Amino acid sequence: MRRKLRIALVAHDNRKADIVDWALNNAEMLSQHRLFGTGTTGTLVRESFMKRGIASDITCMHSGPMGGDAEIAALVVRKEIDFAVFFIDDLNPQPHEADIQMLLRQCRIHNIPIACNRYSADLMITSSLWDDAGYVPKDPIYAPFDRKAFEESLKVKE
């Protein structure tokens, strides 16, 4: 991949081992990009890379419950993140659920791809679209739906 990406890494406590393992499996690729992590997640990835002699550019924010999710969301809003990997613990309640939902919402609103499991993270990081200069992601359409106009647009023009 030629383009240097800005990638956010976030994981709940019960998913931290999973995201570190994913990062190590993708270390060659990730080491070429700028990484942003919530406090503990970013630190764990950085330490795992350092122990293996892998150079990395990782900026650690606060931990999620202390505002790290909100800091990542602010980067998303400013278009300073190209994609996010957020391994969520769906089996246990989180004390900072509002911040989690805010981060997910801002990614959706600002059209920033977010992977919430390993498979989607693998697909995202290996996508050829990152280097396709002709590909321009279309912004989401937030407008009232006009069914009549939509159906008219589908008609074949002769």
Curated annotation (Swiss-Prot):
It comes from the Bacteria. The keyword Lyase applies. PROSITE patterns: MGS. The active site is at D69 (proton donor/acceptor). Pfam families: MGS. Keywords: Lyase. Residues 1-158 form the MGS-like domain. Signal peptide: none annotated. Its EC number is 4.2.3.3. HAMAP family: Methylglyoxal_synth (MF_00549). Belongs to the methylglyoxal synthase family. This is Methylglyoxal synthase.
